[in-house]
Each structure stands twice: as structure tokens, then as C-alpha cells.
From Swiss-Prot:
One of its GO terms (biological process) is protein targeting to membrane. PANTHER family: GOLGI AUTOANTIGEN, GOLGIN SUBFAMILY A, 7 (PTHR13254), GOLGIN SUBFAMILY A MEMBER 7_ERF4 DOMAIN-CONTAINING PROTEIN (PTHR13254:SF0). Its main location: endoplasmic reticulum. The ERF2-ERF4 complex is a palmitoyltransferase specific for Ras proteins. Palmitoylates RAS2, which is required for its proper plasma membrane localization. It comes from Debaryomyces hansenii (strain ATCC 36239 / CBS 767 / BCRC 21394 / JCM 1990 / NBRC 0083 / IGC 2968). Transmembrane segments: none annotated. The keyword Ligase does not apply. This is Ras modification protein ERF4. It comes from the Eukaryota. It is found in: Endoplasmic reticulum membrane. The keyword Membrane applies. Residues 1-22 are annotated as: Disordered.
Amino acid sequence: MQESSTKHVVKEDNITNNGENENNGITEPLLFFNYHEFLTENYNVHPSCRHNSKARSIVVNHFPNNHVPIDSSMYSDTRIVRIPRIFNTIQLSDIIPQFSNYTPGTEPAAINDQQGFTFKPVGIYDNNSFGETSVTPLVPGYMTEEEFHTIIDNINKYLHEAFSPYNVWNLFDSILDLLSANFYNKIVNNFLVDTYSKRKLLELEMYIENDINLGMFASRPGLKILSPRKSGYLSVCIDYYNSHQNHCTNYLA
């Protein structure tokens, strides 16, 4: 099996300390792409493309649902699109998780073609359909761009409030914990009252479950967002039942 990563590769000795590409004295910002996706040349031609020449490679950008048992029907019936963390939108992005609000396939370094923002399957890999570009079936197939941006922006807002060390309530909790020699965090937080950070993370859980899964997606059975807590806040996940063989359906992870 021959697989390769996406198209932008920069030599390490050209990377500056601030994450920019320095080439021949010219400093250019590094371009962002969904680093979960990869290319493969080892695939079968999609039935709809039998009469076309085989593309050199396809972009694998949705994945098996690893949040359910591998022998379950849901594992075979759902797919995951992983929305990655991004690190250049705020300060302290290493401790405050933030996720890319680029619609999948529109990232600055995404792989595109002349067809624009359209998912066109050309190959079958691991019994699922993929195209030549970074565009996934997720948007606009199962949600609009506006819905996608609203969801990701709100998730980012909750996470910023929960993890920012400069939030006044987080500072208050930290001071109490320091003055009590960790008694506040160990005892009070566990048995009496939650810290501000924990309350905000619980609000995020309720937003995802009630406002999105049971609200916005109520008329779209099977489509739902998984809590980013399940991926260790490394990605955001959406799940949709795969109703057709070799037809891509999704998760946002």
C-alpha cells in the first residue's frame, strides 16, 4: 500500500521559530491544511468513472468510526471527518484548544481542482468513496456552510472561556486552589461546587447534545457531533449513517 501525506512539504531547516517558511531570504507564512487527510494511489476506480482515465491519487479525508465497537453495525454504517485544531488564531493556543473553521476543502493549502467546491467521487478505498480534492461530502451534503461555521465558532468560544488562564473566574479558582494548598480543587470542586472551567465544559457538552444534535440536526436522523472531549480536544467529530455502499457519509471529529 502506497500512501503519502498532503501536498505541502517544507524542509525543517527552512522553518523559523515563529512557524514561518524562510526561503532565499523571503519569509512567508506557512499555509494551513487539514493534516488528518492523506493521499493514496492504491484504490479502485469508482463505478461512475469507469470510462475516465484513472487519477494518479485520491484524497482520503473521512475515516472509520473508531468511537464504536468495530464489530457493530454503526462502525460500518458511519464515517468520520476530522476537523483539526488550529494554532494561529489566538494567543496561548497550546493550552486553549481551538478548531479550524475552514469549511473542509477550503483551507489555504487544500487540494483543489477546477470544479470548485463540489465533492466528486473518483475512487474507492477501504470500501468507501473518495475524490481527487480535499472537499468532503460533509458540506454542503449534510449541513450548510453557515451551520458549520456557527457550530465550530461556538465550540471555540466555549473552549476559550473554559481554558483561558486570564479569565477572571479561572484566576479566582486558581488563587483559591493555591491558598488552600490544593484543598479547593481536590475537595470543594469534587464534592461541593464545580470550577468555572468545568462548568463551561459542561455547558459545551449540553450545547452539542441539546442545541445541535437534538435541535439543529433533529430533522436529520443519524447526523450528530461527538464531544471533542472524546478525542482529547484534538479534533471535532460528526456522524452520519452510510445509507449506500461506497457512498461517503460523515462524522465531524
